[in-house]
Amino acid sequence: AGLPCLTSASDSRTRKTTRTVEAISASKDGRDWMGINQNAANRYFEFFLRNGSLNRLATGEVRREVKLGNSRIDFLVGNTYVEVKTPLITLPAPEGTARVKGSRFQSFDRLIRHMGELKDSLASGKKAKIVLCYLYDANPFTPPRPDGVNNKILDAARAAEIAGVERWQVNLSIDRFGVSLIRYFKSRPYTSGA
């Protein structure tokens, strides 16, 4: 009575399981897939970078895991640092789908550090972008309202944006045939106080 899943095989001897769940479907017929493998998101993103599908976002030589200050940033593409985040906090689900209450993500320290490093990189003439990479066709990201828990991350995001760090969104589609790019776009700016 679980959800339909798309899995991939692994021949690693160190894993506890032989399969990885790549995507789930909240629909019983398994038509609407949502990718959940955050480890794969950077590989997918890199593929679309290298084949030129994301050329409005960044172009140039693609380097992975580039040191910047005290952090490792996912990509340096030409003159642009690109940090990819794959949010799984709110996955779309049909009405009536059970949801866990009170399981809120509250560890933003790494993301805040990355935003600061990206902001600081602008002084050297580099460009910097944070990409929200959704493994389904997500609505354009809207920052949550400040609530006491998320104030630090919202302040860091605003400060990075004011300094010139751009925020982009990439929506990918996963099905049993593979991964495809649905759309990508520069995100709307944060508004003050929201």
Model-flagged regions — what are they?
Residues 116, 122-194:
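Non-catalytic C-terminal interaction segments of nucleic acid-processing enzymes
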Residues 27-64:
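Acidic-basic catalytic patches of nuclease active cores, encompassing PD-(D/E)XK
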Residues 1-40:
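Interdomain/boundary linker segments immediately adjacent to catalytic/signaling cores
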Residues 49, 81, 106-116:
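Conserved mixed alpha/beta catalytic, RNA-binding, or beta-rich assembly cores of soluble enzyme
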Residues 73-101, 118:
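Conserved catalytic cores of phosphodiester-cleaving nucleases, focusing on short active-site segments
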Residues 66, 77, 84-86, 132-134, ...:
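Short, structured patches in soluble enzyme cores that scaffold and shape functional sites
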Residues 63-73, 108, 118:
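Charge/polar-rich, low-complexity and marginally structured segments
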Residues 26-36, 93-107:
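Short histidine-centered catalytic/ligand-binding loop motif
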